[in-house]
Amino acid sequence: MRAIVALFCFVLSTSAVAQMGGHAPVRVWQDTLTLPTYEEGPPDSNPPFDQFVTNGRYNYPYTMRENLSDRASPHPWRALNLENEYLRCVVFPDLGGHLYRCIDKRNGADMFYANPSLKFARIAYRGAWAAYGIEFNFPVSHNWMTASPVDFATSTASDGSASIWVRNIDRVYGMEWSVQLTLQPGQAVLEQKTTLYNPSRTRHRFYWWTNAGVQVWDDTRLYYPTQFTVFHGFTDVDTWPVNRAGVDLSIVGNHKDGPVSRFSYASNEPFMGVYHPHTNAGVVHYASRSDLPSKKIFSWGGDADGLQWREALSDNHSAYVEIQAGLFRDQETYGFLDPEQSIHFTEYWLPIRDIAGVTRANPDAVLFLSRVPSANSSRVLLEVAINAARSFPFAKLLLRDGTGTLATDNVSLSPAATYRKRFPDLPADKTYSVTLTDEAGATILSHTEGEYDFVPKGDVQTELPRAYAYPAIEKRSEGDFLELGAEQERNGMLLEALATYRAGLVRFPHSLPLTRSLGRLEVSLKQIPAAIEHLSSVIERVSNDQEASYYLGIAWLSAGQLDNARRAFEVSEQFGTFRPPSLYELAALDTRRGNLEKAHERLAAAAREFPDAPKLGDLDITLLRLSGHNQVAMDRLAVLLKDDPANSFLRYEAARLGQEDKTLWAHLAADPERILEIAIQYMHFGLYNEALEILVRDYPSGVSVVSEPGMPLPQQYPLIAYYRGYCRELLHQDGAADFRAASRMPTKYVFPNRPESFDVLKAALAANPKDANAHALLGDLYMSGGMQDAAMTEWEAARNLNPAIPALLRNMGYTVLHASGSPERAAELFVEGTKADPENAENYLGLEKALRVAGRSPAEQAAALQKYPGKAPPAQLVFQLARDLAAAGRFDEAQRELATRFVSREEGGASLLEVYVAIKLEQAKSLAQKNQCSEARALIQHLTDPVPQLSLRKDALVEESQSQSARQKIAAIEASCAK
């Protein structure tokens, strides 16, 4: 019997391998990879409200992670591994789901930048960012979770392929991205399938850029099939590869004049590549124009500043470039995703070796076609080199010259070997074409020398129009207000857009488009009474305005007016953009009425009609389970999990249906907001028992729970307890114990922004008006929606009860300052904050700013900062203190302050180098004003001397001293001394 079973298993396995073309199935597994990793301190305890943003990066409700160090230690990272006979790839699910490396097993070369240490700098939206591998940027660049754990899973398929899945739902907009990385048996290509999806109730801005770091050397060549490039903001068209200055930027060693950051322009070609003569290896990226039409190259450059970035981001002084692919023309361009809209696209990554360059590429093969001059200038040798991504055993190569076929070569192509063919003694004045076909005669790849899908040069707009300048507010048209508001929304400036729409309605009080836009944005900002007023006025004039009806329905839901909400959704569900989310909302209302069968029918039909809106099917699993149709639910769940195996809600539903998932609970425990995300989906359908079930669970702790720095455990997260108590009350149970527990929990790093939290926190305050935590968190929630007055009212109540709540007085002080209030009043709040929350550096920075606004002396400003008791002041405090001391004439003290702690580099921000040079020039200016010009000139003369205690090198000092700002200051000093 054993022999029969063994034979049966052998037949099955050999049959499976035969279906894979004789190749073994792809392996996928999880283990750990230990790397030297630079330590990160606790995150900033202050909520980064939009009102306080100065750099255009909106992060609330996330913490800021700028507390970086110069100390490294070995760190074991969870690693997801994917391997076939040609490639072995590693993904870090705890670092934004980045692909860390992909090794070409044929030559041991890394396709991407496998930085041997993880060294963080302040580059990402929240701060911490490290250079390596592939980063997934959605809905913003270097997004909020780029250095944090995300959802992940692995899967295998019957064709022998295997996949790694990574995904995330962000907390700022509630938008979701998902990436599936797949290897097929016997193929040397990594497939990347991406889905972008808006499961939230309101529209939000987005873009997508795949960002792949590739290690480079001076002889590395960049193959971007384009004749022109354009700079950020769609400005400054230049030529490629040789720019207008005569520099060939396709050679990395030529990047000597600062960073190179260019987007392809006027090209329809779908590929790009990097090749290293240093290693005879490289990588090619392919995405059709219908998927990702835009390409970008970024390099820090090889000048002094670029070399500093190498030091800041690596321990081995390695250089890398970023090859990027995106949806829009540049990284200043955003679009909108409406509720339940999704986008899908596919990219391919191909390793190349022993091919010398890239002429053309697609997912099947990469071609390098080159001419070798001969002694006779009228003759040439044509060399063809091909890397096949998969096997073509009966391929044929055809060489043509435009008049006919010159030669053919029957060849068996395989990823295991590079194909080369030389065609000698050809006329040099001819143009040659190479075509590769398979055994059926279908074209695998074809190229004609010099022919690319470019916009004809004569049609290329090289002088770009200036950006539209909006007229003064009193001269703006209705369209000006609408487009400016939309532009501000696309840039994340929601409060500015709100002000723009309101200003537009002052000028055009009867404008339906402005009223609709304002009402929609008010819903997004949780300003519900105002939204109901504005959207109702639109419906009064246009009864079938579907957008206004949909958002009015959301507003009525938030106000608890369910019948009004249903009537609004019955209009918006009729057809068009808002039909899918309206069907979802109507199903939720059906369930709240107890009509689960009607809700199921509605969701099932909606899921069939809109398969790209996956949330429509997710809740249907719950309805089937609660209706007793467990087997149907399990069958449907299996289908959904096949397409989205990392979905935490689906994983939880599987567990509710009895399927074992040992890692689910640790995954949920790693971020309490994952638990709330699931609970709120149940609550939205009125399924409070289901919500309570996940909220009351005892979650694990310890090494199995992998969280980002500062993340509280669920059992210490007050919002979990508040939601628990709220659900109990709606179930006619006693929620007092939960509310009481929440009131005693620490609120550090707890920043509410979900609209559902209004009812939850108000219920807690109804139960206990003296709950300081609930007042403080409700104030944060109001502030997140731009409602400063309501926020201050709640914060004042919290202050009277417990002024030591983290960030409370900081929030109040900055709100007074940003409302152009009394700087003296702000200073009082900050002084109180230094006593109640003494380790919070922003209380001291806020006090310094209030004193500055009040016109107090630099010495007083410096004294405020010097009271900070912490051992590791943030860079902002160090730099501001140094500037204030310099302004007070205490230059030696200012320079000493710069040496007090390690300051990580910040892209686009102030650097230690910049502040040092500014201080020295301020000192020279002071000397000149005292007629001590010889001393001033001597100081300027020695400005570029190395400063070992600050790790400032001469080349960097020379470069900074030649900046426009420094030159202007030096010129002013010299002019002063010349008088």
Q: What are these regions, as identified by a protein language model?
A:
Residues 497, 531, 565, 599, ...:
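Single-residue signature of alpha-solenoid repeat helices
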Residues 358-476, 645-660, 726, 730-754:
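Long, contiguous interaction/recruitment modules in multidomain scaffold/adaptor proteins
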